[in-house]
Amino acid sequence: EPVPIKDTSCKRILIDSCVIIEMLQDPEFQNNLFKLFDGTTKPVVVDKCLFEVQKVTGWKVSTVKDVLSRIFGHKVHIIRTTKPIEQMEYSMRFKYPGESHSADSTLLALGVRLDWQVCTKDGGLIRLCKKENVKTIHPKSNGFIFQGELK
């Protein structure tokens, strides 16, 4: 496995950078999203998404990680992009040229490989996830839109 996680009894949801940015900016959005992660569901963040958040917000990666941990009440699992993950990402970018950037391809590849949901507001990523049968969660200010059932 490219991403070993000790506790497999919990559902894992990959969080896209656009969702993280909105969480950092909107406390009401934070509260709505927090309801999704109820103790049996754990947030997972890819390092590439953290770098995107840093680029957009100007916040240090360590600060973003600390804030996310504070929001969720526990340390958020961060996936480092290793060679095997880069290879999976590359295969998705090759399969869908011009349709997604690096972090989106990584989320898509991990969603396919590990059978995890992706939480995103990015319509392009949602379309690609649908093509690959990866379940998505689109957070809205008043709830969630699920593509597929939450596992």
What are these regions (language model features)?
Residues 15-18, 22, 47, 119-122:
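Short His-Asn-centered micro-motif
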Residues 14-15, 28-74, 78-81:
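PIN/NYN-family metal-dependent endoribonuclease catalytic core
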Residues 79-130:
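Active-site neighborhoods of divalent-metal-dependent phosphate/nucleic-acid chemistry enzymes
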Residues 1-12:
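Non-catalytic pre-domain segments flanking phosphatase-related domains
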Residues 20, 50-53, 125-126:
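A generic structural signal for short hydrophobic patches within well-formed alpha-helices
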Residues 1, 123-151:
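Acidic, PIN/NYN-like endoribonuclease modules and their adjacent C-terminal/linker elements
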